[in-house]
């Protein structure tokens, strides 16, 4: 009998569709970025606990704009390195490269799939501008030691919280600790606007820059009349409505995406509680002799069930995948972003790293790590059925 587990189900609910219909039935509506976007940004800021949020068309765009802001504000051009994880989404690395920085890669922990903090600290030097830390799969990647040293060395922290909405460190939501934090609202994430992302900060200048960089670099998007007046006087031969300060593109979202976001945020906390409970039930019933189960759950808010096989046998791995397919269980090998980014073609001409043994943990996850779907509607009975099946497989 098939188990039939997808990576995500029912993430756009009937309630979301009704909210969109209600919005579209209004007599006078604007579909491009307008009041719904502003309201969603305010509600998200309130939920997260930050001063400012900027709604964009994807988490990847949020990443790109954040690093573009760092580049613009960076006055010491000798600081041209940004420390990044080997396990992350491709846009984190590409945002660094496309803005002219050198990515410095760090291996991960099995316990939270985030960067090894000792390795981060070893790689900080005079050239380090920032640490771009991914909170993967709903796990927290921070500790006090890292935060203290980054502050003392004046190294910026950028948080990628795309997969970890609602996860916390010391009871404060992730996304509150960095100079800038980024979120994705892609279909399978904790909150979805189908496609979308958010840039969050407590810094007013960065907020204004994010608004401008979201929209072609246009001055009039800054939402700062005094600043706009000052710049307009500086460029008297330009139309005040068409002054472009930064070399960027259009990353705006729209009113329909914001309407879905406004409806989804109402149930985000309750959905997150279900995800957390699902993950605990999954780990409780999973065979620790065959699979890694010692994850750090403190403050976590699970995005998808991580599976790390203990075996290093490729034949066992292939058998495992064949069995999952036979039960119609959807999976992704390599976990977040497909595994070790250093193995991807886009980096071949940029970095000449051939010795992957320096990154042992991500190498194992690359070949023997997976994630399976976890979502609020997933029933405990199906989780038990899933773990019984996984435990029955001959992969030791």
How does the language model describe each region?
Residues 1-30, 245, 373:
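N-terminal "arm"/small-domain region of PLP-dependent enzymes with the aminotransferase-like
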């Amino acid at each position: 009998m098939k188990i039939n587990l997808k990576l995500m189900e029912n993430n756009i609910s009937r309630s979301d569709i009704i909210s969109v219909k209600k919005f579209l039935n209004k007599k006078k509506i604007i579909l491009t970025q307008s009041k719904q976007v502003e309201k969603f940004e305010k509600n998200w800021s309130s939920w997260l606990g930050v001063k400012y949020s900027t709604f964009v068309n994807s988490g990847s765009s949020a990443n790109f704009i954040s690093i573009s802001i760092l580049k613009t504000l960076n006055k010491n051009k000798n600081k041209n390195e940004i420390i990044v994880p080997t396990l992350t989404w491709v846009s984190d690395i590409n945002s660094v490269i496309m803005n002219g920085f050198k990515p410095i890669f760090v291996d991960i922990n099995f316990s939270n799939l985030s960067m090894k903090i000792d390795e981060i600290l070893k790689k900080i030097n005079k050239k380090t501008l920032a640490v771009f830390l991914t909170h993967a799969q709903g796990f927290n990647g921070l500790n006090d030691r890292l935060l203290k040293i980054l502050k003392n060395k004046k190294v910026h922290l950028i948080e990628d919280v795309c997969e970890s909405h609602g996860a916390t460190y010391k009871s404060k939501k992730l996304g509150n600790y960095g100079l800038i934090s980024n979120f994705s609202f892609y279909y399978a994430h904790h909150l979805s606007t189908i496609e979308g992302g958010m840039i969050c900060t407590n810094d007013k200048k960065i907020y204004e820059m994010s608004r401008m960089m979201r929209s072609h670099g246009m001055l009039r998007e800054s939402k700062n009349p005094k600043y706009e007046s000052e710049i307009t006087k500086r460029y008297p031969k330009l139309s005040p409505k068409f002054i472009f300060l930064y070399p960027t593109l259009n990353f705006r979202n729209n009113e329909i995406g914001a309407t879905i976001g406004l409806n989804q945020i109402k149930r985000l906390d309750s959905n997150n509680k279900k995800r957390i409970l699902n993950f605990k039930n999954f780990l409780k019933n999973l065979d620790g002799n065959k699979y890694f189960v010692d994850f750090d759950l403190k403050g976590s808010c699970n995005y998808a069930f991580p599976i790390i096989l203990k075996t290093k046998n490729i034949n066992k791995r292939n058998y495992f995948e064949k069995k999952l397919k036979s039960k119609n269980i959807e999976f992704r090998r390599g976990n977040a972003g497909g595994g070790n980014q250093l193995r991807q073609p886009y980096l071949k001409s940029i970095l000449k790293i051939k010795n992957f043994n320096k990154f042992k943990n991500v190498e194992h996850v690359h070949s023997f790590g997976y994630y399976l779907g976890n979502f609020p509607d997933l029933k405990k009975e199906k989780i038990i059925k899933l773990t019984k099946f996984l435990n029955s497989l001959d992969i030791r």
